[in-house]
Amino acid sequence: MAKHAKGKIQPRQPIAIVRLDDLEQAVEISRALLAGGITVQEFALTNPHALEALAQVQRRLPGDLLLGAGTVLDAEMARSAIAAGAEFLVTPAFLPDVIVVGRSAGIPVLSGAFTPTEILGAWRTGADLVKVFPAGGAGPAYIKDVLGPLPGIPLVPTGGVNLGNCAAFLAAGAYTVAIGSSLVNKEIVRKQEWPALTELARQFVQACATS
């Protein structure tokens, strides 16, 4: 189970995936998500300034946030993310070198995987949680099927998770879910409609809690 000095990622505690187009919006996005109850936030490193944004959010927002770096592709990126203050690491695929760096630094790793072989490999290598990606096409039934022979592995469906299916993923046995564009909506962000983002975050938190 993912543990950290500030706490741990709880079951059914949704993880927001933030992909930034504008560095200046990082704090506002994070603040709006936090106001809606989402305290675990992953900044995808697809933007070259994502680590700078993560550090900025850490400086300016309350300490009850758990901020991580996503799309970590190798050990070098993992070390850079940790140096920038990332409190957990997320990979899009099973990348053992990233898991090793995270474990050595005492930083939780959500390792990407899809097939049962990859899922078991990530877990045995030391991943704290296993991110099942892409999960949308496979659906909740896939999570249930995988957990049949592999019970006890904390799975985090990612990719294609939305308000319509997040409860079903959890009912199928997922530990929690990670949510990208269906939460951090590009149109909402473009228009800077932060109250709308907060309300959407609240809806996801409620859906996860009551599923």
Task: Mark where each language-model region is.
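Conserved N-terminal beta1-alpha1 strand-loop-helix module at the mouth
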Residues: 1-85, 94, 104, 152, ...
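Hydrophobic faces of well-ordered beta-strands that scaffold small-molecule active sites
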Residues: 13-18, 41-43, 67-70, 89-90, ...
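Conserved N-terminal glycine/acidic-rich loop preference
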Residues: 16, 81, 119, 135, ...
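Short, ordered loop/turn segments at secondary-structure junctions
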Residues: 45-48, 72, 94-96, 114-115, ...
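Histidine/lysine/aspartate-rich catalytic loop segments that bind and position anionic ligands
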Residues: 88, 92-137
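Glycine-rich phosphate-binding active-site loops on the catalytic face of alpha/beta enzymes
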Residues: 88-98, 132-140, 172-194
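Short, charged, surface-exposed secondary-structure boundary motifs
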Residues: 98-102, 120-125, 140-143, 166-167, ...
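Shared catalytic-loop signature of beta/alpha-barrel
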Residues: 121, 142-144, 148-156
